[in-house]
C-alpha cells in the first residue's frame, strides 16, 4: 500500500498564456548594470590595535599592493602606524570575496554536474562550487542547499549554471548568481539580511532577483525562448536585462511572462491550488492514481511526488490535460503530493 499526503498550500501556479521571456530583479539589486560611479563607493573599517595598512589590505582587499590605494584614499602618512579606532575608507570595488559552496541534499534519476569538463553523475552530499553546471535528464531531480539554508530544486530536463557564489570578507555581504539555460528551477530563498546581499537567477534575456521569497523561473529553451515567473511567497521584481532599473513588482500568488526581448507582461493572478477529489483513497492498486477536482480555467495539471513533507526530495512528476494523474511502478511507502494547475 502506498500512503499519500497532499501538499498544495505552498504552491500555486498560473495559467499564463503569453509566449514570453521573463525574469525578476529588484532594481536595487541588479548587479549587471551598476553605474561606473560604484567604483568610487567606499565602506568604513575601524582600525584595531596593531593594525597596519598592509594588514588591512591583505585581509580585506584583493591585492598585496592595495595598501597604496588605502594610503591615497585616506591620506595616511605612515602605513605601519595606525591608531586604534580610525575610520578607514575601503573601496568597495576592491573588497576581497571568498568563494562559497553549495551542497546536494537530494537527487533522483539522472542528474549530473560539470566543472569545466565532462559531465559526471551527482550524488547526495556532493559539493558544488562557483563555475559548476548542473543538469537533469528526463527522469532526473536534484535539490541543492546554499550556506544560508536557501534551497533550489531542478525538475527533469533542466540546466543551471552556478555563476557566482561569494561572500565579501569585510562586510559578510552575499553574492549569489545563477543562470537557467533550460527547464525550471524552484527557489526558496532565506531572507537576505544585508542591504547589498544579492540573489539572482538569470535566463538568456532576463534576470530575477529577490530578498527572500519562494518563486519559480521557467525558461523554454526548446520552444519560443520564453521565461515565466511565478511568485508563491513574498515579492519579486521582474525586468528585462535592458530595463533592469525599471522592475515590475510581482507579489505572492501572481505571475508574469515577458517576450524573449525582455518586455515584461503585466502580473496575472495565479490559479487556486487544486485539490484531490478523493484525498482519503487507499492506493493499493499497481498504478497509483490521483483524481483532481477540476478547475474551470485550468488547461492541465502538474503533479509531483516527493519522499519528504518539504517537497525537496522529489522523485516523480507528470503533466496531464485531464484531471487524473497516473504513476506506474511506485514502490510501497509513504509519499507527499503536490498539485499545480497550468
Annotate the PLM regions.
Residues 27-30:
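N-terminal signal peptide c-region/cleavage motif recognized by signal peptidases
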Residues 286-298:
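Conserved aromatic anchor
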Residues 314-321:
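Short beta-strand segments within Ig-like beta-sandwich modules, predominantly Fibronectin type-III
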Residues 35-61:
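Primarily a LysM-type cell-wall glycan-binding module
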Residues 327-334:
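Surface-exposed, short loops/turns at beta-strand junctions within beta-sandwich domains
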Residues 83-87, 92-286, 301:
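Flexible, surface-exposed loop/linker segments and immediately adjacent secondary-structure boundaries
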Residues 64, 107-108, 295-300:
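Short proline/glycine-enriched turn/loop motifs at strand-loop junctions of beta-rich domains
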